[in-house]
Amino acid sequence: MSGLKQKYIEEVIPAMMDKFKYRNVMEVPRLEKVVINIGMGEAVQNAKAIDAAMQDLRTITGQQPVVTRAKKSVAAFKIREGMRIGLKVTLRGSRMYDFVDRLINVALPRVRDFRGVSPKAFDGRGNYTLGLKEQLIFPEIDYDKIDKVRGMDITFVTSAKSDEEAREFLRLIGMPLKPH
């Protein structure tokens, strides 16, 4: 069992049950999945950019990314319906817990001038999205082997019913949220 999952069972569940007065342990919010997305505008001109980003994302997550395609044609961005414009990976189970553990304890502390993540990025349904400006904060990525610095969006999908519950849940699992 991953260290984060153990922490969830031993510390987070009792603390959340105490604070929110849940009657059943199944009411306690849990992490359902983590979705990592890289939107790539440059893939329109440079088709090889997708392959390099795919290798980076595969190295970070340990899972094969899925290519996302344009839903509609947009002349202003020079994209047509069906063009490859990004990548995404959905992590669940033990891979998800391992990734979140690495993100909180290894990757985020490597961000320059890091003072915590924004507490305002909740969507109203208990999900949290974190934007990263570069993939280099992950120790698996070798600085000499990358072709371009790319950002990514990481969405934490929780079973929380409100943002307040999700905020407390993420704080308890160790997410360094800035005080708002």
Curated annotation (Swiss-Prot):
This protein's UniProt keywords: Ribonucleoprotein, Ribosomal protein, RNA-binding, rRNA-binding, tRNA-binding
Molecular function GO labels: rRNA binding; structural constituent of ribosome; tRNA binding
Q: Name one GO cellular component term.
A: ribosome
Note the Pfam families from the entry.
Answer: Ribosomal_L5 (PF00281), Ribosomal_L5_C (PF00673)
Which Gene3D superfamilies does the record match to this protein?
3.30.1440.10
Q: Which GO terms describe its biological process?
A: translation
Entry similarity comment: Belongs to the universal ribosomal protein uL5 family.
Quaternary data: Part of the 50S ribosomal subunit; part of the 5S rRNA/L5/L18/L25 subcomplex. Contacts the 5S rRNA and the P site tRNA. Forms a bridge to the 30S subunit in the 70S ribosome.
Q: What does this protein do?
A: This is one of the proteins that bind and probably mediate the attachment of the 5S RNA into the large ribosomal subunit, where it forms part of the central protuberance. In the 70S ribosome it contacts protein S13 of the 30S subunit (bridge B1b), connecting the 2 subunits; this bridge is implicated in subunit movement. Contacts the P site tRNA; the 5S rRNA and some of its associated proteins might help stabilize positioning of ribosome-bound tRNAs.
Name the record gives this protein? Large ribosomal subunit protein uL5
